[in-house]
Amino acid sequence: MKVRVRYFASLRQEKGQAPMEVGLDPGATVGELLSELGIEQDQIGILIVSGKSATFGQKLNENDLVTLIPHIGGG
């Protein structure tokens, strides 16, 4: 199955601006996607799947758009 991944903030600088297409086994979870991408779960502040708030255990579907927003700090 294929999903698209969109990055923001520091992840966008690291991974690129355009949404990336990733192939996964059917029934894969968001956590498995992050593992495939080499991203630690604790890096993610906001996680959205196809426009809705999501969890790391959520199963993905064909053509889902996964938006990854890292924790943002400042002072």
Ranges and model annotations:
Residues 1-74:
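Ubiquitin-like/PB1-type beta-grasp interaction modules and other compact soluble beta-rich domains
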